[in-house]
Amino acid sequence: MTRRRFLEGAMALALSPSLDLALAAGCRSDEHLVVIPAGPFWMGSDAKERDYAYRIGGEAARRNRWFDVELPRRRVRLSAYAIDRYLVTNVEYQRFIQETGHRAPSITEDEYQRQGYLVHAYQKVKPYLWRDGRHPDGRGKHPVVLVSLADALAYAHWRSDKEKQRYRLPIEAEWEKAARGTDGRYFPWGNRWRLGLANAEYRVGDTTEVGSYRGGVSPFGCLDMAGNVFEWTSSEFPDGKAVMKGGGSWDDQPGICRAAARHGRAKDARHILFGFRCVCEMDAATIR
């Protein structure tokens, strides 16, 4: 299979207008997957939450009013689905690279400069670059980064074929429910930021192995849903940019690390702060 055909299949599978394609249900909670039961949850933010977020969110967030793009707080009902307990790691992504010949996570300095939002100098990117199809030494259990939306979709397509189940990227609502539970809490653990529960605020200055912050587990049992890296979703902003979730990254202030926070990025963006996890569909659940 050529890389072009593989990517076309991945995009068609994950971005189809109808997300109720049949697949034998076999997803269940285990070491790697968490089942999120059907039912309503509180999604988005209200003025009270955003005011708190701006107080703890840093000067750039306040100056640019980053949190004003968040969806209004409301009850949303979803069908049951399963989601990865952990972010996709370098080791897992390397198996995909080796079996498909897909491009490895990397970016040249020119490509990086053209993206236009240089949060970090290219020198900071170099430790994350893959070489000869292999992830950097010592980072096997770290989340894979420097992947675009298409790269993440291609991985989900490959995983679907390999495990004979339907994997895709989460929509924004699915990611948010898995991160905050049903009661509308700001963070996976509650409504107030707590030190030591997430890899954030540049305290480590790097990604960490997935699942390292056990105290920050979400109500459903997902890890790293605040801090470490932002995560791709299949949802879009009106301007066509992809909605990124993930509760911020290792480089972000606490206000950005809330479950309701959302950020728009070009779909071809590759950055050391961007990773992903997958959803496994259950009983051809229809997302409303």
Question: Which residues does each PLM region occupy?
Answer:
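C-terminal segment of N-terminal export signals and the immediately downstream linker at the start
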Residues: M1, P17-R28, H32
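N-terminal secretory signal peptides and thylakoid transit peptides that target proteins
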Residues: M1-A14
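Well-ordered beta-strand positions in beta-sheet-rich domains
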Residues: L33, P40, R73-R75, A80
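Acidic-aromatic/histidine active-site loop/patch
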Residues: T89
